[in-house]
Amino acid sequence: MMLLAASTVVQAQQDFKPVSGQQGKDAVWVPTSPALVEKMLDLAKVTPDDFVIDLGSGDGRMVIAAAKRGARALGVEYNPKMVELSRQLAREAGVADRATFVEGDMYEADISKATVLALFLLPENLRRLEPKFRALPAGTRIVVNTFGIPEWKPDATEELREECVSWCIAMLYRIPPK
């Protein structure tokens, strides 16, 4: 009986297919293109010494890409099916030892240990997270897809012109000394 139940859970996870534009708790899910994921991590200069956190991590592509670079990475995602899919994809990519996914609310997540935040969120989400950003240690890097942090000036901006159809701008912010 236990084997049948486990088999049913695995099948349900395999049957889950995220759809771009599906409604989430605080935003719709739109995946960042693989090319822009790499551009964002390049802009943030992610190394094996980094701890990358992605709030609203979706299918885990940013976390998995950071882990492939040797960084430890954490994805915080509200949708439990997305969390399970992300864990499965991390196992398949061979980075489950460095890529962790938790079910949770991005507004309640502890981001204090991050050296890099990688985000694709709407301006209203970023505005709501701003107090958490301001509490981060100096030197922490925040890299965002397309939507900048309201009223913050990015330290660097790069637009991807190839291999990206929409939402193709990476912006980097560095937390200044206090």
How should each PLM-predicted stretch be described?
Residues 59-71:
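Conserved SAM-binding loop of SAM-dependent methyltransferases across substrates and taxa
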Residues 72-77:
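Conserved SAM-binding motif I beta-strand of class I
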Residues 10-50, 80-113:
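S-adenosyl-L-methionine
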Residues 1-7:
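Bacterial N-terminal signal peptides
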Residues 49-58:
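Conserved class I S-adenosyl-L-methionine
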Residues 124-178:
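C-terminal substrate-binding/active-site "lid" region of AdoMet-derived donor-dependent transferases
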Residues 112-128:
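A short SAM/SAH-binding and catalytic strip from SAM-dependent methyltransferases
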